């Protein structure tokens, strides 16, 4: 059976007089004095269908029984709309189809929320429960189409660059040094488990050992971790690895890839992209994920703070803390209520308070005015290049607290004062991360244990491992990390040394990574790679508030699927087959 000759966005004045067939959902229904109007909708657009009672009474009576979201196949003739009745907002707004016959393909129950009135705010949990209906509202499908265009462009680009797409296993071995694994019990081997991949990291490195040279994959990955607006338990990444290269070879390819992906949405990205070291990012922006759409750069104020009598400044200086802040142009107009609000805001991130200093026609107004000489205030204004009506905002705290507090504060103020537009795209490579960091007093890998140290820092592995920098690189866009990668360790002895520093016992190394260490010992080429977060990339491209909006069937913030009611209990017979007993 033929359901349509045209899509619902295709008919124009050029088709007037033609007999056509359309299929779609009843978007809106109106009966105006014996004339039935139906907006018929498919994924591509809307066409107005009309039936007049005085011309076709039986057809009119049948059509009058149709309701929202019923699925119809309609035959009829394309006619011009009456003068003054055109709709310039529709591609089909100058025509309508006079119904000759129609067939109801499917009926719909009463809807849990309106499809046609997509401006109405609907509870997100209800939208996720009825995700297939939420898709019909149009916005979700537009985002999924963007995702498709990005994936298609990625595959074409990577193929042209000589990369081979390889699908790596989903059932693998648990190596829980990173986030928690999702585990899959084995029926054939009772008491043993597979793990779903947090990334194809080991497999893609083994492909380099195997001589593939250049690999990529749009990989689905799984991490059992607490969720945020930009995290899901399962997510997609553009996974890339190449042999016989370094960052000078790989990073330009990634920049061209990013420019190609953004071009699918008509966005031009100037190349090359900016670069800054991890330490520069921390010093100037308080974070390794700086949003460069606006300035508000942080500056170290310790040399000025020590010339004050402010006890909080002096206490932080005595205990190895810092005093830093930024200048807000025109911010001297901020009220005391606003400044008190910012003070409470930074306390959420561990700061004890907020120092403010206003430059008002050359005069100083500050909540620490009595603790610092006028001359020092004016030197601070010159240091920050603060003009009349600017304000300085400073925090005294341990370095990590000051950085985190000021990072969040500068983002908040930039948003409130509209210092950037949503169609700005500011990329930056962050390089030279620490190889290790401290977590609860324990040395852990900053990225993952397969990241190579910078060659000049290798001697520090034995004397000061926390000072070792890594040959790693993150790509940050508007404050979001959208890609992360590194040069890999290809020397088995160096890899074993890294595991030892991480306090992974020889027995544990052999159990979890013995196969990998063995592979490295059979002649491994120098190699490096990167993974781009596909969900985050599309989220930015579509200005979505969450990656849930760019995934067809996402989980909630609590990692549940409200539509399928997953996770769910399973039958006792299934548990028995898997030799599993559930205890709470």
UniProtKB/Swiss-Prot annotation:
Aspartate: region residues: 201-204
InterPro entries named among the record's database cross-references: Aa-tRNA-synt_II, aa-tRNA-synth_II, aa-tRNA-synth_II/BPL/LPL, Asp-tRNA-ligase_1, Asp-tRNA-ligase_1_N, Asp/Asn-tRNA-synth_IIb, AspRS_core, GAD-like_sf
Quaternary assembly: Homodimer.
Pfam families in alphabetical order: GAD (PF02938), tRNA-synt_2 (PF00152), tRNA_anti-codon (PF01336)
Protein's name according to its UniProt entry: Aspartate--tRNA(Asp/Asn) ligase
Role according to the record: Aspartyl-tRNA synthetase with relaxed tRNA specificity since it is able to aspartylate not only its cognate tRNA(Asp) but also tRNA(Asn). Reaction proceeds in two steps: L-aspartate is first activated by ATP to form Asp-AMP and then transferred to the acceptor end of tRNA(Asp/Asn).
Residues flagged as site, Important for tRNA non-discrimination: 32, 84
The organism's place on the tree of life at top rank: Bacteria
Residues involved in L-aspartate binding: 177, 223, 447, 488
GO molecular function annotations of the record: aspartate-tRNA ligase activity; aspartate-tRNA(Asn) ligase activity; ATP binding; nucleic acid binding
